[in-house]
Amino acid sequence: VLGQGASTSLQALINSDKARYLGKSVMDQFGNLPYLLKILDVKDMLSIQVHPNKRAAEEGFKKENALAIPLTAPNRNYKDDNHKPEMMVALSDFWLLHGFSPAIDQHLDAYGFLHGFKAIFQAEGIKGLYQQVMELPQEEVDRLIAPHIEVILPLYEAHQLPKSSPDFWAARAVHNFCGDGHFDRGIFSIYLFNILNLKPGEGIFQGAGMPHAYLEGQNIELMSNSDNVLRAGLTPKHVDIPELLANTAFVPTIAKIIPGSLNKTVQLYPCPIGDFSLTAYFLKAGEKMEFTVTSPSIFLMLNGEVQWKGNASADLEGAAAFFSTPGEKLLAEAIVDTNLFWAAVPGQ
């Protein structure tokens, strides 16, 4: 946050007067700003992750504190006692893994290196299948994956695989994560999960227990204020398999993509939790819009130029963001065409 003299962090500003910057309602309910807002530029595939629900986070945080595991330890799962549901909106062509595919049985038939998992899937469903995949000895992971990679890697390097194919991402994962001579077991998950392609302006919500991974593209991500991540592959970092299995939702997922466009005047992204809300706006040059701020809010401009008038006035252009406190009334006038997002706390 820029002000008079040296800059300070938003968290430090909030801590200096929570009643002022959060409002009494949010302060009493959450004790802090209940959300985090990020822009991601995914050039290399990110790890497969699952986030715990609120109760699991509280119990896990308490347990790891009792075990005196340092918050910075690589084997620490719970950095806080909060859940971490997420809403993401694509800013470019965006690819991700999202939940277990309803067509897993077809994938087990279609790919030879997966045939050996058919029996466990038929007997124990998704949970049994995924547990077996995650608990395989590394030598068995390498033995199963290696022959398939030998076939698809030349196709990937010759640009003959479409991004809609799990083979494309499996081959890319080899380049990104398998430099130690072993294959990352997350490669199996690429064939078990939904592969989604969101267009700019489209969004999707990912709740507790939903396995997911961002593969490529730029997006906005709004999430609950937490650092709790249970990793599940495509990473050199710590993977706690028992904790992962205890927090994963083993259900087939039909993706609920929120239709949208970055050229729509107002675009709502419904979030089924009370921690945050997200709305996108496209203001044409000369257009004005009023905002009544009832909760701690972050306004994020992607581009353009806007004259803002409220308790203070500012002319912001390009990529810019600012924090607004409850009770403010803002008037925005676009000097040129501008895309902006408003993150807030609903129901205030």
Functional labels for PLM-detected ranges:
Residues 40, 195-205, 210-215, 220, ...:
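Short acidic-glycine-tyrosine-enriched beta hairpin
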Residues 39-43, 50, 82-94, 197, ...:
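Short, conserved beta-strand element in jelly-roll/cupin
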Residues 218-268:
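C-terminal, non-catalytic macromolecule-binding modules
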